[in-house]
Amino acid sequence: MSQFRPAKKRVDVSVGESVRIIRELQGLSQNQLAERTGISQATLSAIENDRIRLGVERAKVIARALRCHPAVLVFPGWEDRADSAA
């Protein structure tokens, strides 16, 4: 029987990747998100590929369109230490 590496308990995700993941989980295309936010599809693509910074104002607009808290987008790797210590 072959040996397998143990699964990672945590995966590091960039800000852009978090935008893409949440958008895709909601079944939205970049064009659909662009329509909801007024942010161009090209800019959304650049954000998702970490070519430009998300920024606070864009984070608020995108979070509203994706129905999530802006912190979910801005701090994708954040972990509540109080919960994880138990």
Predicted regions mapped to residue ranges:
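Short, charged recognition helix plus adjacent turn
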Residues: 1-4, 64, 74-86
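A short, Lys/Arg-rich alpha-helix, primarily the initiator
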Residues: 2-25
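Short basic helix-loop element that most often maps to the first helix and adjoining turn
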Residues: 17-36, 61
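Residues in the helix-turn-helix
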Residues: 32, 43, 72
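Recognition helix of helix-turn-helix/homeodomain-like DNA-binding domains
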Residues: 38-54
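Short, basic-rich loop-to-helix N-cap that marks the start of a DNA-contacting helix
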Residues: 51-64
